[in-house]
């Protein structure tokens, strides 16, 4: 793709939008950026772009801005069916995302990880496994560094390990990961995709451009993944926590094994993992498949996994205050992630739920809440819906995270767990799930400091 002298519009001024705009400008494109946020909301970003000679439009998306372009690059948070984009496509203007842009400019090998839950942990772990195997590795995508930023860092021997969201997969054309994994597919982002079927179809696109010798890694315990495997053109590696598989990873007698036509290899005991929870066993199984597919030796895989700690905001132990353990799982932005968090504790859980609703029912939590939780504290815009649907456990309307932590700390007794696993997006009260998690940790640490006085 040659963008020199081309008029390119970048829509959305998040991390990937800014990275795309600055990269395209450096490549000689005539770049305009457009964001519906106000100039005041973008006061930090705008000067950086103007200094590079990039035209900035804020507060709205002008029809003419979209019309007078040779290429449009959209950020993941921008709806693919936005009217201005629909009109641009009708006019024959290509509309792609930042991941597709990266696919055309970043050299080297690509590993892509998607799924409803576990993406960030697995992507980070895969990066550690490849580094342990002596490979030049870059980790990013939907976490940390936008993939397009790797254009200046990668060469033909580099492995780019990317977390990929369903939003990013909506806009791919040539994006082809040599190794791609779907960890699981459960209801999420239904407010964006409309139906579960459309959401699953977006996830499946990760394999769309793979070739026969590439690898597709899939969860044998997840029905949508099993269905997707029937349509995959590449080599399938399975992972399963529940049963043995012929080609892939599984658990037998609390040990992780990899099996293929050449035979069976023990990788490591499950007890050697630092990660907590059954769902993290699944994440490790998937990451081991990635390591094997990338020709990393079993002992190097074992070393990386045994040293890997929980990623921030993913079932992250925060502190123990008056005998009560506090865990930050702010990344649990859907119901299935909250289920996995609850399954990590046997009883005595004080659960903080709520935020911006994503369209899934909360009734599926009820059996587990009855079994393992003492109290649910609701916060944010979804509070009323949660309070109407959650049964079999005490529910307290807390409104804010600060009040929820306060109420939970007053009610919890020694041996209990206070768990932030909201099952919702964060944007009603916070800038991001990271922001929500940081606030939770600050509140808990203040209590811990008070206890020491």
Curated annotation (Swiss-Prot):
<dbReference type="InterPro" id="IPR036565">
    <property type="entry name" value="Mur-like_cat_sf"/>
</dbReference>
<dbReference type="InterPro" id="IPR036615">
    <property type="entry name" value="Mur_ligase_C_dom_sf"/>
</dbReference>
<dbReference type="InterPro" id="IPR013221">
    <property type="entry name" value="Mur_ligase_cen"/>
</dbReference>
<dbReference type="GO" id="GO:0005737">
    <property type="term" value="C:cytoplasm"/>
</dbReference>
<keyword id="KW-0961">Cell wall biogenesis/degradation</keyword>
<dbReference type="GO" id="GO:0051301">
    <property type="term" value="P:cell division"/>
</dbReference>
<dbReference type="GO" id="GO:0008764">
    <property type="term" value="F:UDP-N-acetylmuramoylalanine-D-glutamate ligase activity"/>
</dbReference>
<dbReference type="Pfam" id="PF02875">
    <property type="entry name" value="Mur_ligase_C"/>
</dbReference>
<dbReference type="Pfam" id="PF08245">
    <property type="entry name" value="Mur_ligase_M"/>
</dbReference>
<dbReference type="Pfam" id="PF21799">
    <property type="entry name" value="MurD-like_N"/>
</dbReference>
<comment type="similarity">
    <text>Belongs to the MurCDEF family.</text>
</comment>
<keyword id="KW-0131">Cell cycle</keyword>
<dbReference type="GO" id="GO:0009252">
    <property type="term" value="P:peptidoglycan biosynthetic process"/>
</dbReference>
<keyword id="KW-0133">Cell shape</keyword>
<comment type="pathway">
    <text>Cell wall biogenesis; peptidoglycan biosynthesis.</text>
</comment>
<keyword id="KW-0436">Ligase</keyword>
<keyword id="KW-0132">Cell division</keyword>
<keyword id="KW-0573">Peptidoglycan synthesis</keyword>
<keyword id="KW-0963">Cytoplasm</keyword>
<keyword id="KW-0067">ATP-binding</keyword>
<dbReference type="GO" id="GO:0071555">
    <property type="term" value="P:cell wall organization"/>
</dbReference>
<comment type="function">
    <text>Cell wall formation. Catalyzes the addition of glutamate to the nucleotide precursor UDP-N-acetylmuramoyl-L-alanine (UMA).</text>
</comment>
<protein>
    <recommendedName>
        <fullName>UDP-N-acetylmuramoylalanine--D-glutamate ligase</fullName>
        <ecNumber>6.3.2.9</ecNumber>
    </recommendedName>
</protein>
<feature type="binding site">
    <location>
        <begin position="115"/>
        <end position="121"/>
    </location>
    <ligand>
        <name>ATP</name>
    </ligand>
</feature>
<dbReference type="Pfam" id="PF13241">
    <property type="entry name" value="NAD_binding_7"/>
</dbReference>
<dbReference type="GO" id="GO:0008360">
    <property type="term" value="P:regulation of cell shape"/>
</dbReference>
<dbReference type="InterPro" id="IPR004101">
    <property type="entry name" value="Mur_ligase_C"/>
</dbReference>
<dbReference type="GO" id="GO:0005524">
    <property type="term" value="F:ATP binding"/>
</dbReference>
<keyword id="KW-0547">Nucleotide-binding</keyword>
<dbReference type="InterPro" id="IPR005762">
    <property type="entry name" value="MurD"/>
</dbReference>
